[in-house]
Amino acid sequence: MDKLAYVHAQWDDEANVWVASSDDVPGLVTEAPTTEELITRLKVMIPELMALNSESPAGPVPFELLTRRFEMTA
């Protein structure tokens, strides 16, 4: 896969985790308490899911993590 995979993550305030999914990587849904942990999981899951979907990458898979979190002022 030479194209960039876009991964969207939104903060789940009730569960206190980032929830991520991607239209570019079928089956990708994961969560983690920090964006750093989320990135670590994505680096493993993206190539695994691509292989399961018969889209084995020739090398590293580039991805962009887009985060969204809503907050309120005090």
Where in this protein do the model-derived segments appear?
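Short, charged, surface-exposed hinge/linker loops at domain edges
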Residues: 1-8, 25, 36-74
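Short aromatic-glycine-(Arg/Gly/Cys) micro-motifs in beta-strand/loop hairpins
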Residues: 10-23
